């Protein structure tokens, strides 16, 4: 019997699945509408919900103002971030994702995005107005990882 268990232990393969962002189709549509309404500037938003071992589950979207009013950068004010964080905590949730748009480029992190992703350890959803694509990324262990976006 021990030989069977030892053989099993040696041949057992562990599969580690990446986490996903779970977000409703209506929230995705709201983010896209916000991005298109802010063109040619980048739009931004904070998404609140809960993180589990397997995913980040988005429950609410808070559209925010881009303080930079820029085509290539965005900044969410500390006051807006604090307000959203306070609302999330009252609902036993947390900020689980940062959203912003790229009006004239791909749905992938820019050099500036990567710099800020390293200090904001959330998944980042990026929507490209140019290609109408939405992708999600997280920067962890000095590595950029793409995360799947799933409908709730």
Predicted regions: what they are:
Residues 101:
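Short, well-ordered beta-to-alpha junction loops that form the rim of enzyme active sites
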Residues 6-8, 12-95, 104-152:
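Conserved beta-strand-loop surface patch within small alpha/beta domains used
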């Amino acid at each position: 019997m021990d030989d069977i268990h030892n053989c099993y232990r040696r041949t057992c393969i562990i599969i580690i699945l990446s986490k996903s962002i779970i977000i409703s189709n209506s929230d995705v549509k709201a983010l896209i509408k916000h991005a298109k309404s802010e063109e040619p500037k980048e739009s931004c938003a904070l998404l609140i919900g809960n993180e589990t071992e397997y995913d980040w589950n988005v429950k609410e979207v808070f559209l925010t103002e881009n303080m930079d009013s820029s085509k290539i950068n965005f900044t969410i004010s500390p006051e807006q971030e604090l307000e959203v964080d306070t609302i999330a905590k009252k609902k036993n949730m947390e900020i689980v994702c940062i959203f912003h748009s790229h009006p004239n480029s791909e749905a992938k992190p820019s050099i500036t995005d990567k710099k800020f992703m390293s200090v904001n350890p959330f998944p980042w959803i990026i929507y490209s107005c140019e290609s109408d694509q939405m992708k999600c990324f997280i920067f962890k262990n000095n590595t950029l990882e793409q995360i799947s976006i799933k409908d709730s």
